[in-house]
């Protein structure tokens, strides 16, 4: 019975991602993947497939594996990034880049890749993708250029450089926290595989699109100026930079990362409220920021955690772990992780792998690499892919599952192997 419920839940989640990503109830659109996972988890509880005390112990545990702490960390960090987006910081930076690079598609292509890579390192891949995709679509339409090279480049850059720092992706946070890997240790290990992966992925991107980039950009297109409240910008940047620095030294000052991010996200709301009161401006930015936070991840991650606990309780997790540990852990966990992520999504894959027994620390880092690069192999690989495909439809850009996977396999497989080989050499 437990296996039947789990397999059915996973199949339905994949089908929802591919065929009905959103459910519309009156005027409210809800992502379909999390209610399915929630129903699956509830069925496991109702059929006594997993003891309730096991779940309570896991959710109240005072350790790094506690999924509630990890969710608080990620959502709090995302709020800091969303705030800067609402202020207009990312659009402002993008506009400045376009003005400097306008005229040459090749320069624009390279410049946007570098800019998106840089911003992703210190914020979140999901936020960067959601911010830059509308901008690229709008600019390409008005400049009469093909948006596909820039959109794919943006998506690849964001999901490659998201593995550079621990804060770049919820999967990084989850796996690192589960095995007590701190900010500095993570950075020391992952920076080189990230750089190599970036060089390989960008080289393939350039080879794929170099002919299309020879067309000149319509230089007469004027970019609309973005007005930014400097006070709000300073507040946002201060909180993001300070949080990142404190996360980097969290293990040395003995403060848990989730407490730092929660404290600064609350401080951001309080400081902004005080500033808005003094300046007599609307509180809209706070409400808009909080409204955009990825709350759907809460039921999804908690439900998948229950499903994985059931698999662990049934002995299936240890069987998969034993199988992957039989060969070289870097390549078995890296390739195996990417395959599993593209079957069940990278967040459930990370929850599953966090419950495994790793033969070495290399296995953990290989799993992190897999969880990031899996995002651009198929749309199923990550929530970012699902959101991105949905966003393209709203801008009437025809980019099918087949086309996504075709580009994803061409770029993703060499990039994954290059990153894993680098990890194998250095670790």
Predicted segments with their positions:
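Hydrophobic alpha-helical membrane segments of integral membrane proteins
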Residues: 125-132, 152-153, 260-263, 377, ...
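Hydrophobic alpha-helical transmembrane segments
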Residues: 7-17, 53-54, 102, 131-147, ...
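Helix-loop-helix module between adjacent transmembrane segments
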Residues: 77-85, 103-104, 115-125, 157-165, ...
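Membrane-core helix-loop-helix motifs of multi-pass transport proteins
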Residues: 1, 139-212, 216-228, 234, ...
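Hydrophobic transmembrane alpha-helices of multi-pass small-molecule transporters
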Residues: 1-82, 86, 192-198, 202-313, ...
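Membrane-embedded alpha-helical segments and adjacent helix-loop junctions characteristic
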Residues: 56-145, 283, 296-360
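Alpha-helical transmembrane segments of multi-pass membrane proteins predominantly involved
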Residues: 129-130, 179-182, 365, 369, ...
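Hydrophobic residues within alpha-helical transmembrane segments
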Residues: 111, 115, 156, 191-192, ...
